[in-house]
Amino acid sequence: MIFKEVELTDKILSELIDCSEAWEQENSCHGYRKNTEEDIKGNRIFLALENEQMVGYLFGFMDKGERKNSIYEKDEPFFEVEELYVKPELRSKGIGKQLFGYMEEKLKEEKVELILLSTATKNYKAILHFYLDELGMEFWSARLFKRI
């Protein structure tokens, strides 16, 4: 398995959109829709490759806190993870964890000290286990809804 950060090319864009379309079809996240070029452009892209084929991706962007809150100071830089995806047949094999770890090491080299992400999965117990127990993230907040 190879992990690397890549520039957006037409081929990579097409593969990312194909993966996100498959993810949309899984119906595993509330409100998830497949990505468009506009959703992906401008993000940093990290890939998991097996035999030169994309099997997972992570993309996100650098941002700064608009105002101080309980997690970061005003203007403190952080990396916001937009999406982390591994093909269904390869899940639970540590690929997502390794991909996240690769991205984290790259950010540490750049002196980035904070990573944020939100998730809209329907299987919150599994995803909290993954992010909290497997990746060592901390729980910040929860946004809940009830359709009536």
What are these regions (language model features)?
Residues 72-88, 142:
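Conserved acetyl-CoA binding element of GNAT-fold acetyltransferases
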Residues 130-132:
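Conserved active-site tyrosine of GNAT-family acetyltransferases
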Residues 24-49:
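Active-site rim helix/loop that mediates acceptor-substrate recognition in acyltransferases
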Residues 116-127, 145-148:
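Conserved beta-strand-loop-alpha-helix junction that forms the acyl-donor binding cleft
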Residues 47, 53-62, 80, 85:
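Conserved beta-strand in the GNAT
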Residues 1-16:
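A short beta-loop-alpha structural element at the N-terminal edge
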Residues 50, 58-75:
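A conserved beta-strand-loop-helix scaffold within acyl/acetyltransferase catalytic domains
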Residues 86, 92-105:
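Conserved acetyl-CoA-binding loop-helix of GNAT-fold acetyltransferases
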